């Protein structure tokens, strides 16, 4: 096989692997939780050390809006599939527990009850830049 042909095969294989395996990158939010930037910055997922963004990460969807304190992470999620429930999830950082999807009203009530009513909310992209 000629050098040019071998080079073209290698180049094509490299391009295919690069497209299929967009490894993304992650930044620590708090505790063992990370914001994972995927698909060249078009999607953001919430993950921990043991979870990948495949399948929607920890919240079964993409992060739309996020806020955090030392004890809680508040996330508005967009489900990966249209039949799933849109809304908010709250992560208890210390207990490592995630709520079911809840309404914005319930999230605001828990935000206040948790003493986090003054924390700042960010779009996923803005949170990525802040982290």
Where are these regions (language model features)?
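Sec-dependent bacterial lipoprotein signal peptides
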Residues: 1-19
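Hydrophobic alpha-helical segments, principally membrane-spanning helices and signal/leader peptides
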Residues: 2-3, 7, 54-55, 61, ...
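Short, intrinsically disordered low-complexity segments
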Residues: 4, 25-27, 41, 77, ...
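Intrinsic disorder/low-complexity detector
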Residues: 6, 34, 50, 73, ...
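Compositionally biased amphipathic helical and low-complexity segments enriched in hydrophobic
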Residues: 7, 12-13, 30, 36, ...
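N-terminal export/targeting and maturation segments
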Residues: 19-66, 122-130
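Mature extracytoplasmic domains of secretory-pathway proteins
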Residues: 47-94
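C-terminal partner/receptor-binding element of secreted or periplasmic proteins
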Residues: 95-131
């Amino acid at each position: 096989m000629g050098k040019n042909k071998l080079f073209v095969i290698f180049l094509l294989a490299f391009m295919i692997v690069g497209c299929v395996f967009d490894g993304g990158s992650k930044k620590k939010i708090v505790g063992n939780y990370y914001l994972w930037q995927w698909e060249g910055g078009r999607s953001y997922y919430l993950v921990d050390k043991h979870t990948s963004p495949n399948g929607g990460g920890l919240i079964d969807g993409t992060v739309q809006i996020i806020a955090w304190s030392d004890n809680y992470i508040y996330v508005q999620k967009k489900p990966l599939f249209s039949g799933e429930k849109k809304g908010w999830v709250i992560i208890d950082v210390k207990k490592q527990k995630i709520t079911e999807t809840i309404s914005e009203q319930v999230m605001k009530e828990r935000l206040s009850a948790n003493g986090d009513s003054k924390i700042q909310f960010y779009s996923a992209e803005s949170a990525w830049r802040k982290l």
